[in-house]
Curated annotation (Swiss-Prot):
It is a peripheral membrane protein. It comes from Oryza sativa subsp. japonica. It is found in: Endoplasmic reticulum membrane. This is Multicopper oxidase LPR1 homolog 5. One of its GO terms (molecular function) is copper ion binding. It comes from the Eukaryota. Transmembrane segments: none annotated. Cu cation 2 binds at residues 211, 257, 620. GO terms for cellular component: endoplasmic reticulum membrane. Cu cation 4 binds at residues 522, 619, 624, 629. Its EC number is 1.-.-.-. Glycans are attached at residues 100, 234, 308, 349, 357, 425, 482, 516, 553. Highly expressed in roots and basal stems. Induction: Induced by phosphate deficiency.
Length: 637
């Protein structure tokens, strides 16, 4: 018997022993985790593994799961209804990580685009699209089984993870009928203790929110405007099958995703997310930016997978979801072959809770930032790294022609701790900081076409903070955690269901002083409005102020003016524009100017933004949003 066969036999025997022991003693399964991890590390399911991939697949399906009471239950099946957390001593099945998936074996998918307008007599005209939500499987990695997902598409066959990018034209309305074709039960478990849309007749509630969109409230995707398959059942604020997006705002990058009450974190985790772009050729064409095949979306999202391919999430609500696999455009650690030329990369962090601090091979190439969220910058800004919160978008140019001739590979790396910013700065062996790889053509390779693009000298001159009408109101927005019931994360000590307290007048500007009493950085997102941070002030005597606020929930009583006197931290240059998500650091008061009007034209909305059901604002860490860092926002005439 050859040494390789002997080694293989020993590994297989070890796997059988560990699995059998764990199944015989579920309560003591944790004692076998180290042995199992060792076995799986050797098997590895990699192309260079000791054993062929098909044998590895068989072994990987033999691991213990939630220690099922059913001895015949050998496969994990996503629950058809919410289930309690596993009892003490029960184990999850081993998951896919950077240790058992080979990186850079799948090419980066090019996301399909849907044109959101028609052409008649050479001019763009409004059209109607029908886009559905479908249940299917998706291959996240060459060596993984297919994964059950929920995805957007114009048909089941064309639906993808992420969904198709809708390309709209500024000033041309787009009607979309959103259709729910999802099954009777969610593919992921959800926690019934969190306020959740629960239909009486079964089905998966969904509603689509255009993140960054300026539109009437009835088209906003309100959390209570959910509906189930074939519109069989709907929430209290549902009114229509078709949403109309006026696309009157400035050109830029948006995205659309599910927003049903209490299910946002699991439905986006399942795949209900996609990009949306508003174009304005007369403004953008003269900028001569990289276009066509050299203009790409990079939709980054972390996930955790069981080794049978299904997505893993705890059955009970947890403060943050962090996956051990980094996906870009629906592939785990993909690669992209590029020419030595400029590329435009529209980078969206679509993760539930993970922040990214990305570099290109630790600064080998810079990012030239031309836009953030749905707005261009007033001028390009060159940086060595980008910090992206969940839901944040950076529009950048990367010039691969600047690489040394001998350098033909460059990695996108992430160094952000998790939770951000105070998570441990210890390297997790299951997550090594890699995001994706760019394979750069050799110096002598002939480009497919000459690079005539450029980095523009100037961006877009939106109305500045000073040019807008002066703020009519100053509001104090306080972010709490565990103020009442354990686990709740509230804004101003209130829930979504509590009476509205933020009632700005449509067309006005306000100053929001956002105070973060938690240990996390929170990406603040306001529906309808665009906004920008102007400064961040350290809160001195933080614990004294926090204790007072938890007791009194009143900034005047707690002498905010005596505490918000610490060092002032400037806003990064690449974030100085009108945004849809602003980072709120812990122990700071962040001053945010909020424009309830169109900032490109510096005009009021050309539609009625005061109708029902109103809007919301919330933290865009999805686990926080669901429980319950979200509040109503009602514009007044």
């Amino acid at each position: 018997m050859s040494p390789r066969i002997q080694q293989l036999a020993a590994v297989l025997l070890a796997a059988v022993v560990v699995v059998a022991a764990a199944r015989d003693e579920p309560a003591a399964a944790k004692n076998y985790q180290t042995q199992w991890d060792t076995v799986m590390s050797i098997l590895n399911c990699k192309s260079d593994s000791l054993i062929p991939s098909y044998i590895c697949s068989v072994i990987s399906k033999s691991r213990w799961g939630w220690a099922s009471d059913d001895p015949n239950d050998d496969e994990y099946t996503p629950p058809d209804h919410p289930l309690p957390a596993p009892a003490a001593g029960r184990r999850r099945w081993p998951v896919m990580t950077s240790l058992n998936l080979t990186k850079y074996v799948d090419s980066l998918p090019r996301i399909a685009k849907i044109r959101g307008y028609g052409i008649r007599h050479g001019r763009p005209v409004p059209i109607k699209l029908t886009i559905g939500m479908y249940s299917k499987t998706w291959q996240f990695h060459r060596d993984m089984p297919p994964t059950p997902v929920f995805v957007y598409g114009q048909s089941l066959q064309t639906a993808t993870f992420p969904g198709p990018t809708i390309v709209a034209r500024q000033g041309v309305p787009l009607a979309v009928e959103w259709q729910n074709h999802l099954p009777d039960a969610h593919i992921l478990p959800w926690d019934p203790k969190v306020p959740t849309a629960i239909p009486k007749k079964g089905g998966v509630p969904t509603v689509v929110h255009l993140h960054g969109g300026a539109h009437p409230p009835e088209f906003d995707g309100h959390a209570f405007a959910w509906f189930t398959r074939d519109f069989a059942e709907n929430g209290s604020t549902w009114t229509r099958k078709t949403y109309t997006y006026p696309n009157v705002q400035a050109p830029g990058n948006l995205w659309y995703h599910d927003h049903a009450l209490g299910l946002t974190r699991v439905s986006l985790l399942a795949g209900l997310l996609a990009a949306y772009v508003i174009e304005k050729p007369e403004l953008e064409d003269p900028m001569n930016l990289p276009c066509g095949d050299h203009d790409l979306h990079l939709v980054i999202a972390d996930r955790e997978f069981y080794t049978n391919g299904s997505i893993s999430i705890d059955r009970e609500w947890k403060p943050e979801y962090f996956g051990l696999v980094i996906t870009v455009n629906g592939k785990a650690w993909p690669y992209l072959s590029v020419q030595r030329r400029r590329y435009r990369l529209r980078i969206l962090n679509a993760s539930n809770a993970r922040y990214f601090n990305v570099t290109l091979s630790n600064g080998a190439l810079p990012f030239t930032v031309i836009g953030s969220d749905s707005s261009y910058l007033s001028r390009p800004v060159t940086v060595s790294n980008l910090v992206l919160s969940p839901a944040e978008i950076f529009d950048v140019i990367v010039d691969f022609s600047r690489l040394p001739a001998a350098m033909t590979e460059i990695e996108m790396l992430n160094t952000a701790p998790y939770p951000f910013p105070n998570g441990p700065n210890v390297t997790d062996p299951n997550l090594d900081g890699k995001v994706m790889l760019f394979k750069v053509a050799g110096k002598g390779k002939v480009d497919d076409m000459p690079d005539k693009s450029k980095v523009p000298e100037h961006g877009v001159p939106y109305a500045s903070v000073a040019a807008l009408p002066p703020p009519t109101t100053t509001r104090y927005i306080v972010l709490y955690e565990n103020q009442t019931a354990p686990g709740n994360l509230y804004i101003n000590g209130l829930r979504l269901e509590d009476p509205v307290t933020e009632t700005p007048k449509s067309g006005t500007t306000e100053l929001w002083q956002v105070i973060n009493l938690t240990g996390d950085n929170h990406p603040l997102h306001l529906h309808i409005a665009t906004f920008q941070a102007i400064k961040m002030t350290k809160i001195e005597g933080f614990q004294v102020f926090k204790d007072c606020m938890i007791k009194n929930n009143n900034t005047a009583t707690c002498n905010l003016d005596q505490h918000a006197v610490g060092p002032v931290v400037p806003v990064p240059e690449e974030e100085k524009t009108w945004k849809n998500a602003v980072k709120i650091p812990p122990e700071f008061m962040t001053s945010v100017v909020v424009a309830f009007r169109l900032v490109e034209a510096n005009q009021p909305y050309p539609f009625d933004a005061t109708t029902e059901p109103g809007f919301v604002y919330h933290c865009h860490i999805l686990d926080h949003e669901d429980n319950a860092m979200i509040r109503p926002l009602k514009l007044l005439p």
